[in-house]
Structures are given as structure tokens and as C-alpha cells.
Amino acid sequence: DVNFDLIRELPINLLFDNTSYASILTGVYPDLTSQFLECESHKKLEGYVVIQRTFRYRNHFINYDFLNNYKKLLFIGIESEYDDLKKTVKNLEFYDCLDFVEMSEIIKSSKFTLGNSSLAFPIAEGLNVPRLLEACPYFPAAQPHGKNAFNFYFQNQFEKLFKYLYNL
């Protein structure tokens, strides 16, 4: 057993959010290139590009406006973050998840998941669905692992990888 309360007492940086970092604390070393979470598929929301973009850890080198050329874009997360992205991506839809289980079901049922360093991305990693990480230049701790798992710093990378995953 792992006493996760001990994490609060250790002199470690809890801001480091790479999934593999948990292995140092737990002594458990899963194959991060394989699926290590399970859930059901969502019954109603399938085939969307699922987006979660928090205000924290944004990459200010990129712009989401090209997403207006794509369909079935679904934002999950906080409504104020949705409202902010909706100013740029006019065809973006919002869904307020009931809980993290439903969020996982939606991610599992997605065409792929796009996000910055937030809860949705590690869930997508665990479910091993296609995923795209908006890497944060000033805090590049989160890293994708495995097949069809990418990150980007620059606009041309973002657009190329988005198109690739959209057409899988």
C-alpha cells in the first residue's frame, strides 16, 4: 500500500505533473505506452475532438483559430475556460461532465483528445487514446507517451498534428 498523505509531508515539488513522476513516489512502474485505465464508452458523445484547455500552462506561441475549419469539437472542463476559447473557436461545443468517470468515458469515446497540462491529458494517456498536448514552454513537465501521442510548441506543428489525428 502507498500512503499518499505522505506526499504532503515530503520536500518535493508537487507542480511536476509528468505521469511517470508518480513512479518515484509509489514504486509502481506501469508501461505508460499501454493502456492503464479502464472505463466504459460514453453512450451519447462519440467521435468528437475532446478539448480541455486550462488558463494555466498555456502556450502563447499558438492560436486555435484554425479549428474553425473542423467539426465536432467538444470542450470539457470549466465553463469560463470554454467561454475564453469560444471567442476564437466559434463552432466549439460545451459539455459539463457530471464527474471524472463521465469525463473519462467521453475521452475514451473521442476521435482524439487535445489539451494542455490538465486533468484530461493524463486520463487520455491512461486510456491510451490518440492525444495531442499543448506543451507549455515555461513549464514543460507533462510529456506524452506511446503511439499517436504528441506534443507541440509551434503553430505549424499544432496544425500538422491536429490534421493527422483528425484524419486517423
Regions found by a protein language model. Give the residues of each.
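Catalytic machinery of carbohydrate-active enzymes
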Residues: 1-168
